[in-house]
């Protein structure tokens, strides 16, 4: 599953690339033998003895992971590289453990030229400003010069076109990994390790394949069913096989990329949603309302109030799509924390909620809408009475026309 730290790791270069001015270039550096390159001072070794499982004691000569959350002793030196570079005007800089990426922007008075652009530094000049640190740079990894297209943390970043994709080698690697899993375990039992390996790979690439996020819960739910028993063998469920076939088909496209857009200011259009199991869904857009009354047979296993609240957001997105709202960040108010959390993550363990999120993300991707869901107390939610059948005036009713997906056609009696 996605972790918040991983999200931040990827979101920072995304913002950097999306907002990069014309002519921006980047260069990647890799520190060789990162966790073994900074030995412990001999006088400190008596205090760095560790006990192994066999009750033997070992001296830690390199102390690779630090005495605190410092990304190892070498990590502190890497941080020094960043600090000096920034003080010397070599910035902005991105760093993840042993990987460092520096950018350069065009300037009017630069002495280094590439195409029609001038810059303050090139690769050699940047390295000269930290040469006294004697950092052992990897000879085969990293870039030999600044360029417009560069790899970093496993992704290919295209600065002029402002998009991100998988490097071809990795796309083929992950495509092959999914294919082998399907060939090996469709209708056959697999181990916990087998699922964890494919799940971890797809979690990573889901940053590029955003609509794939909702194709991950079937794997994480299956992992949970093992209850940490690494020796158990289980049959992959049909839902997981279906999701993996989607991944196989999607990874088959060598031209797939994710467009990166600068994050726009968050706009408050007065968007409110609410749901009631006793009546239906209420939606407010800029003071106008619409409502969807539930069919009496709407509730089946897995469809609960949280699902209904999520569907309310989904339907709101169809309304915004019909209004041709796009390329924006929008504030959306909901009084259900479960819905806010699930849509924020892009997935849910609940099958029906997950399908709703999947449909919602199709609209978000096509309209380039970034939702900012915030909690509003029910008593302060103007959509609350609408969801309970207390409708507004006909003059203040939303009049845009749109169609519900087939999965929701029989959930509601009518659109009031």
Which residue ranges define each predicted feature?
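Catalytic-core region of right-hand nucleic acid polymerases
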Residues: 1-75, 172-220
């Amino acid at each position: 599953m996605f972790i918040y730290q991983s999200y931040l790791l990827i979101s920072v270069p995304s913002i950097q690339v999306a907002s990069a001015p014309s002519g921006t270039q980047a260069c990647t550096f890799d520190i060789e033998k990162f966790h073994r390159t900074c030995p412990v001072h001999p006088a400190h070794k008596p205090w760095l003895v560790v006990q192994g499982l066999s009750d033997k004691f070992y001296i830690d000569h390199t102390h690779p992971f630090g005495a605190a959350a410092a990304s190892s002793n070498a990590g502190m030196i890497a941080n020094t590289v960043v600090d000096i570079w920034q003080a010397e005007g070599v910035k902005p800089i991105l760093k993840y453990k042993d990987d460092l990426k520096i950018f350069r922007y065009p300037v009017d008075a630069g002495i280094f030229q590439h195409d029609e652009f001038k810059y303050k530094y090139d690769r050699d000049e940047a390295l000269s400003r930290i040469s006294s640190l004697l950092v052992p740079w990897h000879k085969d990894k990293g870039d030999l010069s600044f360029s417009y297209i560069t790899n970093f943390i496993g992704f290919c970043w295209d600065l002029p076109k402002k998009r991100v994709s998988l490097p071809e080698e990795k796309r083929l690697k992950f495509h092959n990994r999914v294919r082998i899993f399907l060939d090996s375990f469709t209708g056959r039992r697999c181990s916990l390790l087998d699922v964890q390996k494919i799940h971890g790979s797809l979690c990573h690439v889901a940053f590029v394949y955003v609509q794939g996020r909702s194709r991950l819960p079937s794997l994480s739910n299956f992992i949970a069913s093992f209850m940490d028993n690494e020796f158990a063998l289980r049959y992959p469920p049909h839902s997981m096989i279906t999701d993996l076939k989607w991944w196989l088909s999607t990874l088959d496209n060598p031209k797939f990329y994710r467009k990166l857009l600068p994050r726009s200011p968050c706009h408050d259009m007065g968007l409110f949603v609410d749901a009631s199991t006793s009546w239906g869904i209420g939606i407010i857009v800029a003071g106008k309302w619409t409502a969807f009354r539930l069919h009496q047979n709407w509730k089946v296993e897995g469809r609960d109030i949280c699902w209904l609240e999520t569907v309310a957001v989904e339907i709101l997105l169809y309304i915004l799509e019909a209004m041709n709202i796009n390329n924006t960040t929008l504030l959306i108010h909901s009084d259900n924390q479960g819905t806010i959390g699930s849509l924020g993550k892009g997935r849910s363990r609940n099958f029906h909620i997950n399908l709703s999120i999947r449909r919602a993300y199709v609209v978000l991707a096509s309209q380039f809408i970034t939702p900012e869901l915030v909690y509003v107390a029910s008593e302060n939610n103007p959509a609350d009475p609408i969801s309970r059948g207390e409708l507004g005036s006909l003059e203040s009713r939303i009049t845009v026309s749109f169609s519900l997906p087939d999965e929701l056609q029989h959930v509601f009696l009518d659109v009031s």
